[in-house]
């Protein structure tokens, strides 16, 4: 079973639908309706932290769940969930250089983890005004995807823990305008 923590976002059920289409059994719980002990009782095999309209500080159980379950089960953070993953390990969340609400971007990636077998560059849909500050990302993470500005690396679009099954993507793979979203999510399920 995959537990999807809903950070009160309209895209949560798009993620739910994509994971169900990939054959996953998915349980959705709001970020303020469960405690860590509730998650333990549910005994998920995967944990996904959804997008949301706030910062990780207002994302209910999200950061605490990442800290508690890191190394115990695979975790994927999407948009706000990606930011929560970084913040849980000490990275700072800051304002993005440009607000990206409903805009597509061609991003670059390393072809590892959730990006395994995906096109590079990859067109993705972005809905965010915050990002992880690159120089605060701890060494235990590698940047696996990034946007570019004038041919130079710009903002972090994907991270992966070097030792634990933890990954984050700043964009929305579940958006209809994102390329290969199903494959990215399938890569998470079948690591």
UniProtKB/Swiss-Prot annotation:
One of its GO terms (cellular component) is cytosol. Gene3D superfamilies: 3.40.50.880. Pathway: Cofactor biosynthesis; tetrahydrofolate biosynthesis; 4-aminobenzoate from chorismate: step 1/2. GO terms for biological process: folic acid biosynthetic process; L-tryptophan biosynthetic process; tetrahydrofolate biosynthetic process. The keyword Zinc does not apply. It comes from the Bacteria. The active site is at residues 79, 172, 174. Monomer. Heterodimer consisting of two non-identical subunits: a glutamine amidotransferase subunit (PabA) and a aminodeoxychorismate synthase subunit (PabB). Part of a heterodimeric complex that catalyzes the two-step biosynthesis of 4-amino-4-deoxychorismate (ADC), a precursor of p-aminobenzoate (PABA) and tetrahydrofolate. In the first step, a glutamine amidotransferase (PabA) generates ammonia as a substrate that, along with chorismate, is used in the second step, catalyzed by aminodeoxychorismate synthase (PabB) to produce ADC. PabA converts glutamine into glutamate only in the presence of stoichiometric amounts of PabB. This is Aminodeoxychorismate synthase component 2.
